[in-house]
A protein has these predicted regions:
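C-terminal motif of bacterial Sec signal peptides marking the signal peptidase cleavage site
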Residues: 34-38
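Bacterial signal peptide processing site
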Residues: 40-42
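Class I SAM-dependent methyltransferase Rossmann-like catalytic core
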Residues: 62-91, 95
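Conserved class I S-adenosyl-L-methionine
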Residues: 97-106
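A short glycine-rich, Lys/Arg-flanked "PGG" loop and its adjoining helix->strand segment in the class I
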Residues: 115-116, 196-209
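Conserved beta-strand signature within the Rossmann-like core of class I S-adenosyl-L-methionine
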Residues: 125-127, 210-218
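A short acidic, Gly/Pro-enriched loop at the edge of an enzyme's catalytic core
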Residues: 157, 171-181
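A short SAM/SAH-binding and catalytic strip from SAM-dependent methyltransferases
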Residues: 178-197
Length: 306
């Protein structure tokens, strides 16, 4: 269920519904508003440059507001202590006005943070499964849940666009149209199903030169096996292997962060990473033990398109 550009689902439903409002925002950006209003018929005062501090303050305030927003569930908020969304997105360099593509958003944990931040000044595109696809597919179930969520909270999600990914081809949008591509804890899935090259190729194509590819991933011990079965069973990838694969696709590692590190994670569990919260694959067995460990140790990597 991966591949061609398809604006069905959320994109077709919401972008049609809100097209007029979106057009106004494009034609009259907020930055030009002072030029449209004179004072007593006189010339508008000269525009002042926006400082780096103002820009940072703006995105900081938007992230804080999004994290506290009603579009997020209490269950999602409880995971902030492990996923550090504000710090992670700031590390990736999220800014007002960006076009951001999120690959494989699941049921929208990060989407619920990104959508309000980019709603008025920017664009968010989510690329995932087809809500009208095989009902037995996990991708279809996630896409249906995400679409339902979007329709229930249009105040946050009305301008999100969607791309359906299918096996026939991969496209995340027009070439060099995105400032940032993000994905969270998905790399092991691509290794397992053999789509890593397709995903990275699509990310490279949609990004502008100098654009950012930001990702988090469950981190295996250095030198751990990277064959599809081992990775699929464990859910972990060694950091050095991820960097090597991504750089071979034309990106350069610009920086890495330990904001999502967890030294308590021993990475040797009966059900792989899913033994840990929030999944607790073993149910009540040793629940307190795994709860005390917390969520997985994760690499947080920022690449740039050369």
């Amino acid at each position: 269920e991966r591949g061609t550009l398809d604006y069905r689902g959320l994109g077709g439903f919401l972008m049609h519904r809100f097209a007029a409002r979106s057009l106004v925002l494009v034609l009259v950006p907020a930055a030009l508003a002072p030029l449209a209003v004179g004072c007593g018929g006189g010339a508008a005062p000269p525009a002042t440059a926006t400082s780096a501090a103002d820009v940072k303050g703006s995105i900081d305030a938007k992230l804080q507001s999004a994290l506290a927003g009603a579009q997020r569930t209490e269950k999602e908020r409880k995971r902030d202590a492990y996923r550090h969304p504000k710090e992670t997105l700031e590390f990736f360099g999220l800014k007002d006005g960006m076009t951001v593509v999120e690959i494989s958003p699941g049921e929208g944990w990060y989407t619920a943070v990104l959508a309000p931040v980019l709603r008025d000044h920017g664009k968010l595109v989510v690329a995932g499964g087809d809500p009208n696809g095989d009902p037995k597919s996990e991708g279809t179930k996630h896409a249906q849940a995400l679409l339902d969520r979007f329709q229930k909270a249009p105040q946050a999600f009305d301008k999100v666009q969607s791309v359906v990914l299918k096996d026939s081809s991969w496209s995340l949008g027009a070439p060099e149209s995105a400032d940032m591509v993000l994905t969270f804890r998905n790399f092991h899935n691509w290794v397992e199903d053999g789509t890593t090259e397709k995903v990275l190729g699509a990310a490279f194509k949609v990004l502008k030169h100098g654009g950012v590819l930001g990702m988090t991933e469950h981190r295996a011990n250095p030198g751990a096996p990277t064959d599809p079965k081992t990775v699929g069973d464990s859910g972990y990838m060694p950091e050095e292997a991820v960097v090597k694969i991504v750089e071979a696709a034309g990106f350069r590692l610009e920086a890495k962060s330990e904001v999502n590190a967890n030294p308590k994670d021993t990475k040797d569990y009966p059900k792989g990473v899913w033994t840990l919260p929030p999944t607790y694959a073993l149910g009540d067995t040793d629940h307190a033990k795994y709860e005390s460990i917390g969520e997985s140790d994760r690499m947080t990597l920022r690449f740039v398109k050369l």
